[in-house]
Amino acid sequence: MIKKVLDIKLNVKPVFIMFAHKYYFEGPCRMTGGEALQPGFDSIVNGAIFNGTMEGINFSMPDCVNVMEPVFMEPTCDWDIKDEYFDKIFEDEPEVDVYLASGAFGADQIYNEFAQRCKKTIMIMPDIWGPARAGYFYNTGVDVICEPTWPDLARHMVVLRARKAIREANILLVTRFNYDLPVAGATDSFVNLKDVTNKMGVHFRTVNAHEIVDQFHPLTEEGNHTTPGRVTPNITEEEIAELEKVADELFAGAQDVEIEKDMMVNSLIAHKVIQKNMDLYDCSGCVIPCPDICSTRRMNKEKFTFCLNHSLNLEQGIPSACEYDVAAAVTMLAEIAISGKAPYMGNTLPIMATDPRGVNLQLLHMVSEEEYEKVKDMDNLYVVYHSTPHRKFKGINEPDGSYAIRHFAYDQKFGAVMRHDFNEDKGQEITLARFSGDLKRMMIAKGTIVQSVGYDQNNCNGGFIFRVEDQQKMYREQWRSGLHMPLVFGDYTQELKMLAESYGMEAILV
């Protein structure tokens, strides 16, 4: 089964450890008078607090949270501590991700012992007394989170869901030569994937690239060339017929089409085979080494690329990275979980003043002079481009955006690629991020879309120019992080910062 990030829920169990006085008396532990001192009054107040708070919890929790059955207990001024209290709290602990706890003055011993026994994250329900509750937890090594307001807490819940989604993810690695890094492409990615698993929990499932390409044709009785006699998830004749219809639908919705249908179907077959392998290995994303596979000449023979596969995966909330960029794929996991939007990954490069027009010479093949003439202020510009735009920049569950379909190969015109006119999004704020290859930091940046580029071009050229606050600062940080900076529409810098710091990484904001 394909495990989609947005299907992951954070299981949150509210715990109310209240307190009730059994007798009438006054003194330094009673801060009221009149009827409030009478036995039974505390229980009335505690019940009202419980009902009102639960109503607030159900209202304020983000969609990614599953609120579990709450626990309510009311120890007394006998200072009673009973095992049954903890049995009740922890009866469904294996399913719990986070305990959302509230403790009344007087119930401190039970509240603190609950924390000592707990093996999961505890979030303190927001109120001004939070530090009094959280201080003991923190000082004794409990994984505790204390936020001042409910919106702050809800945002932190989103970050915790992202951690869970990453921890439970399996990423399909289509390999040719190496496991950790490609021969060509994203050699600035994670240096050691075992370290990634140890730190973040995500696991990896490998499939040989030649086996994948063999599966682009229906399985024969003899099996595939690379796996003779074995049953493999090859494309079927029925699936090819369905993909013919998918091609027609994609053509009908596109603003512009510049690829023949048979070439389009070839790329859809590649996508279908990747998804069948992801389904087989319970994966949440995939990474493919396009240069490493390209040199086999099998893409040239079969007339396809994996570009459309990445676009269609991303639209479904499935991280999908080219150039075997595992760091980008894991970053995408985080961005999807936090934003609910489909990321876009591309070459992320500064536009330096290297000639009178301020155009990087190495970008002239992609960014036309006409496009640059539309950019009046040349300060602090970056450009991002690749062949994997899509229709879900505004949200995975939002209506499709506009798009065009072109081809990758200039001469033979194979390899379907999507295009999006980012001029429709001028002024849109974006968040870019990337985990560093040594797992020591996460670079997080903001920008604003200025001008679309490459919309009318083929090959690996679709993207946009954007403006950052300080180009030099961004570049000086980027060289420690890597080329591809997966991005999403909107400002999610604080959530990504919280996520990085939760892993003990340095969060670099530029």
Residue positions per predicted region:
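N-terminal basic/disordered segments at the start of proteins
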Residues: M1-G56
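Short beta-strand elements in bilobed, periplasmic/extracellular small-molecule ligand-binding domains
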Residues: N51-T76, V202-N208
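Conserved, well-structured core segments that form the ligand-binding/active-site neighborhood
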Residues: W129-A342
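Cofactor- and metal-binding active-site motifs of prokaryotic enzymes
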Residues: F72-R167, N178-D180, A184-S189, V359
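Short hydrophobic segments within beta-strands
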Residues: V15-F19, I124, L172-V174
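Extended hydrophobic packing segments that form well-structured cores
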Residues: V12, K392-V510
